């Protein structure tokens, strides 16, 4: 893969020639309006923990970033949670042992968060009526560890949008140019009786009801709900569950 430039804002995202100043102004504007700014980083396996912390320190000190979602090695959670500079910065990882990190004690400030992939898996199973899914559904609905927060979601940038999860049972990634070989084959979705776009009133009504059921479960679960941008108005990627390369809305 391409080596990332971890210390610089992406210039192509900026409207001006000065991406650094523009990014800083954006963060300031968010803070002035009571909105926190969290960034997501993906570090390759084996990346030295010292380098990872150096990157986080840079963005926290230079731009006053409020938190980070670190994709990849969750073993960094323990070291990052003990870092003096990051002790009040939100740190989100995919899976870690909070009980071991805090030795069974409740931390004075819960800055660790779990990107709760298990929630998506089991709530989607329950939503589409899979047999034997009730016990896992009730567990994840009420799960709230004392040591860290949980971020619950039913869709994110990896996989189907929420609307597509009730509209497609198969991925449709041919536009990506990889012969539909990319993207996950296990999506835990139900198309409500027709694959993709349909004019059938009964199918469309059922999809809307399933969307409402999904949002209700997400908003009433213990933890912090995460809504993928666009899901609030039923955005569709036309069944593409790996749309990172698509220049569209």
Range-by-range predicted roles:
Residues 42, 46-48, 166, 172, ...:
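Short, function-defining helix-loop hinge/capping sites that tune catalysis or transport
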Residues 237-249:
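Extended hydrophobic/aromatic segments used for targeting, binding, or gating
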Residues 21-106, 114:
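Active-site neighborhood of glycoside hydrolase catalytic domains
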Residues 7-8, 14, 154-155, 161-163, ...:
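Generic, ordered loop/turn and secondary-structure boundary motif
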Residues 77-229:
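Conserved alpha/beta catalytic core and glycan-binding cleft of carbohydrate-active enzymes
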Residues 1-36, 45-62, 175-196, 248:
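Aromatic- and acidic-residue-enriched carbohydrate-binding clefts of CAZyme catalytic domains
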Residues 228-233, 237-239:
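Short acidic/histidine-rich active-site segments
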């Amino acid at each position: 893969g391409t080596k990332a430039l971890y210390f610089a804002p992406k210039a192509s995202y900026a409207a001006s020639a000065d991406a650094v100043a523009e990014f800083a102004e954006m963060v300031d504007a968010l803070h002035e309006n009571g909105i926190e700014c969290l960034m997501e980083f993906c570090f390759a396996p084996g990346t030295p923990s010292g380098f990872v912390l150096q990157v986080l320190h840079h963005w926290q000190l230079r731009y006053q970033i409020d938190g980070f979602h670190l994709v990849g090695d969750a073993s960094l959670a323990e070291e990052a949670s003990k870092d003096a500079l990051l002790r009040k910065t939100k740190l989100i990882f995919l899976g870690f042992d909070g009980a071991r990190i805090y030795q069974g004690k409740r931390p004075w400030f819960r800055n660790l968060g779990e990107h709760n992939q298990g929630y998506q898996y089991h709530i989607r199973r329950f939503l589409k009526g899979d047999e034997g899914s009730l016990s896992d559904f009730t567990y994840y609905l009420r799960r709230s560890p004392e040591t860290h927060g949980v971020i619950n979601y039913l869709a994110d940038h990896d996989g189907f949008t929420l609307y597509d999860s009730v509209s497609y049972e198969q991925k449709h990634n041919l536009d990506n140019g990889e012969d539909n070989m990319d993207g996950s084959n296990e999506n835990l979705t139900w198309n409500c009786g027709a694959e993709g776009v349909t004019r059938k009133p009964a199918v469309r009504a059922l999809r809307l009801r399933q969307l409402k059921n999904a949002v209700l479960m997400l908003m009433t679960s213990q933890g912090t709900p995460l809504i993928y941008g666009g899901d609030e108005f039923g955005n569709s990627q036309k069944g593409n569950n790996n749309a990172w390369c698509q220049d569209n809305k």
